[in-house]
A protein has these predicted regions:
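A short acidic-Thr-Gly-centered motif at the start of a beta-strand
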Residues: 103, 151-152, 409-418, 475
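Conserved DEDDh/DEDDy metal-dependent 3′-5′ exonuclease domain
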Residues: 80, 84-95, 138-142, 147-149, ...
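Metal-dependent nuclease catalytic cores that hydrolyze phosphodiester bonds in DNA/RNA
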Residues: 1-114, 123-153
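Short conserved beta-strand segments at catalytic cores or DNA/RNA-binding microdomains
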Residues: 143-147, 437-449
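Short, C-terminally biased terminal segments at protein or domain edges
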Residues: 108-130, 324-379, 386-389
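Acidic, Mg2+-coordinating catalytic module of metal-dependent nucleases/exonucleases
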Residues: 198-201, 207-252, 258, 538, ...
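C-terminal extensions
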Residues: 238, 248-325, 362-443, 453, ...
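Long, low-complexity intrinsically disordered regions
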Residues: 135-139, 153, 157-159, 172-175, ...
Length: 602
């Protein structure tokens, strides 16, 4: 049995992913998205940036031949090389056996397979758990750093350091550092006194091995038992963690086939564990559950139990339900850190809205997702440019749909404003450049029954200020029109740009008061039979289709980067088309919610 640092990292994030990486059918893997490939390149570039200031040597060996890699690394260590990049450390007696093993390399052990001869031997872990199989542990720290101290090599020894794009020393990084240190101890005959993470902006960060070693051994034991016993973990869909995984389609299909509770918004892993102890394991049993009894458990605080039960009822009936009045009032004005207690919020991290849009993209970086691909890119010397995938439209797009031929009379709605003229606003951004390059506005004139889309596009970063001014001019062309948007990114960006470009308060503060967050309105007033309260699932449930079916916010990040490199204007057209559809989808959701609330009142 082969256990690599990559596999252990996957196991910490998702047990099922580690199982499928080892035992799954690789033909079922999703191809990596353009966004994931972009993250890989970004991670490679960051490692190159760090290594520019280091003098290092690297072991060379046939790809996937860990034994050859370990021998080459050992030779460099015996020579006393100061820095060794991507050395191979193996815990086991080389040459005892030479069974063919499949090693997972590439995109965090997802997309490529190599066959390498890896020797195996029984590994005696620092735990009481017996293992029947022969086990080989393979570690590939980003750097082995020489330091004073006796070892089998002489009066020097080594410590490990991993380069992460993240700003935070996350626990899974620290566990991997402890794994490196454990195997390094057997190679050099001395237990390392420390292990290091090299973090963006923070630099070197020391891992407390005394604290992390016991945790590492416990995690390692569980991982070995899972693979040894072929004990496939239960599927669980967690949108934040699953979206970029190569097994997403496989796992989601399995979850759909059994109507798994993790597909319900609000059913987190902790809550699902509690529900299982109560023998509530399907949608019907949750829909019939007593929410007052659920509320006695700490996993269901602050009326969450009621909302989760109602969510199951909505799915069972396949119809929307009115959220309880008291719950809506309690949530009004509450600023959330992360996700709502009910998790009826955008479930991703690429944007705060559809597919997640984060102001801090570094929290979703390629070092976390693909910790091993960067060395493959560095070894190839030249980074191959990412090709635009098939979801970039080549043929002319279908015309934008004309929505709502019979608009709701302004006087009928007392729940959500229906104005003679309404503005629907959506932004596209390039987070790494801190650039908001597209302000899309759909102007809906209900009186004249017209709809017109305005796309204020910056073809380079230098034009951001100009499109900001153009956008403001349009807002003041309709001085009392409400401005509808989905999630709070538009509000945050509006404030940021006003400050950045020293906009007088009288030009932007009155406009800010006209913003209405449709996402907030939906999540506070309705419960819908959707998997996520992001824009796409809601609008699609209502029958709206994007003209570019596979386009999303992450793809737009890739498209804009490709535009800057190629100057291909068809790329800009695809971005603007997607942005317009986002505005129109927001329009659909807003009109539906107004009608829904009106019907509930009647």
């Amino acid at each position: 049995m082969l256990i690599t640092d990559k596999l252990l990292l996957s196991y910490q994030r998702c047990n099922l992913r580690a199982f499928l990486d080892t035992c799954g059918d690789w033909k079922q893997l999703d191809p990596p998205s353009d966004f994931l490939l972009k993250l890989m390149r970004d991670s490679a570039a960051y490692q190159q940036q760090v290594l520019e200031h280091e003098t290092y040597q690297q072991p060379y060996y046939p790809r996937g031949d860990w034994e050859a890699g370990a021998i080459a690394t050992l030779s460099l260590m015996q020579q006393g090389v100061d820095r060794i990049y991507r050395g191979v450390l193996i815990q086991g007696e080389l040459g005892q056996t030479n069974d063919k093993l499949t090693s997972l390399v590439g995109i965090d052990g997802q997309y490529f397979s190599d066959m390498g001869e890896v020797s195996q031997t029984n590994i005696h872990l620092s735990s009481s758990t017996p293992h029947s199989s022969n086990i080989t542990l393979v570690s590939r720290p980003h750097l082995l750093i020489k330091q004073p101290g006796q070892s089998k090599f002489g009066d020097w020894s080594y410590v490990t350091a991993d380069i992460w794009l993240s700003k935070r020393p996350k626990l899974d990084y620290q566990i991997i550092a402890a794994f490196h240190a454990r195997i390094l101890a057997t190679v050099q005959g001395k237990i390392p006194e420390s292990a290091w993470l090299m973090l963006r902006k923070k630099g070197f960060w020391e891992v407390n091995l005394d604290q992390r070693n016991p945790q590492m051994f416990e995690i390692l034991d569980r991982c070995i038992q899972m693979i040894e016993n072929l004990d496939k973990p239960e599927v669980f869909i967690s949108r934040q963690k699953c979206n970029l995984c190569g097994w997403y389609t496989t796992c989601h299909g399995e979850a759909e086939s059994i109507k798994h509770l993790s597909l319900l918004p609000g059913v987190t892993a902790g809550r699902y564990a509690r529900l299982k102890t109560l023998e509530i394991t399907d949608v019907e049993s949750l829909a019939n559950a007593n929410s007052e009894l659920l509320a006695d458990y700490p996993e269901f605080p602050d009326r969450v139990a009621f909302d989760v039960v109602r969510q199951a009822q909505s799915h069972l009936l396949n119809q929307p339900l009115l959220r309880e009045e008291g719950r809506r009032k309690k949530e009004e004005g509450r600023r959330e850190e992360g996700r709502h207690d009910t998790d009826f919020d955008t479930d991703t991290r690429i944007k705060d809205r559809e597919e997640g849009r984060s102001e801090n993209l570094e929290e979703l970086n390629s070092s976390e997702i693909v910790p091993d691909i960067v060395d493959n890119i560095l070894n190839d010397i030249a980074v191959e440019e990412v090709k635009i995938r098939e979801n970039k439209p080549a043929a002319p797009a279908k015309p934008a749909p004309i929505l709502r031929s019979k608009p709701i009379p302004y006087s009928q709605s007392v729940f959500l404003s229906v104005a003679p003229i309404e503005l629907y606003f959506d932004i596209e951004a390039e987070p790494e450049m801190n650039l908001d390059y597209l302000h899309g506005v759909l102007v809906v004139d209900r009186y004249n029954k017209t709809e017109k889309f305005h796309g204020f596009l910056a073809e380079s970063a230098a034009e951001e200020g100009a499109i900001w001014e153009q956008f403001l001019e349009l807002m003041w062309a309709y001085p009392i029109a409400p401005i509808f948007h989905f999630c709070d990114y538009e509000v945050k960006t509006f404030k940021r740009l006003a400050k950045l470009y020293h906009t007088p308060a009288y030009l932007w503060k009155p406009v800010l008061k006209r913003f209405v967050d449709i996402h907030k309105q939906v999540t506070q007033q309705a419960i819908m039979p959707v998997e996520s309260y992001a824009l796409k699932p809601i609008a699609r449930w209502l029958g709206f289709d994007w003209r570019d079916a596979k386009a999303n916010g992450a793809q737009c990040v890739c498209w804009y980067d490709d535009w800057l490199k190629t100057g291909d204007r068809s790329i800009l057209e695809a971005i603007v088309r997607y942005n317009e559809d986002d505005c129109r989808a927001t329009y659909v959701v807003k009109d539906w919610l107004t009608n829904f609330l009106l019907n509930q009142k009647q």
